[in-house]
Amino acid sequence: VNAAPERVEKLLLDGTIHIAQLHGQEDEAYIKKLKSLTDHPVMKAFSIQEKKDLDAAAASSADLILLDHGKGGTGETFDWSLLEGWTKRPYFLAGGLNPENIPEAIQRIHPWGIDLSSAVETDGKKDREKILQAVKTVRNFESSKHFLENKRVYG
């Protein structure tokens, strides 16, 4: 978090990471600098508390955006009603997601992708069984008629 762009560039170039996922106070100048240093995708996380936070996310020069609660590891979601009908750009959804609420998130607010962390951990470490259950939940929902009829294409 808040590492110098050159440090993130090094991690991308040596293959340690493949996407720069920014969760700090990185501003547009930082994102543009990092993008000038590498061809790897840059993802910026935004804490969503009100509609204006969505405007900031939509305006970001990051290749990808992640919409989050902002309080990591609490298991809390933000107010998803803020995203209902929001189609300004594809986004990853994070914050409080678990196998029980993933179907609701997909059906209700149509994220392009999901980001799971503490919900698939046991004692602070990734739990293979929890990960497999989450993947199974998404795949089961993806194969449903509702998902196929409502999948959005952005251009």
Model features per residue range: what roles?
Residues 32-34, 106, 117-155:
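C-terminal helical cap(s) of enzyme catalytic domains, especially alpha/beta-barrels
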Residues 2-101:
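Conserved anion-binding
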Residues 56-64, 107-111, 133-139:
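Ligand-binding grooves and catalytic loops that recognize ribose/phosphate and carbohydrate rings
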Residues 23-27, 70-77, 108-132:
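Glycine-rich phosphate-binding active-site loops on the catalytic face of alpha/beta enzymes
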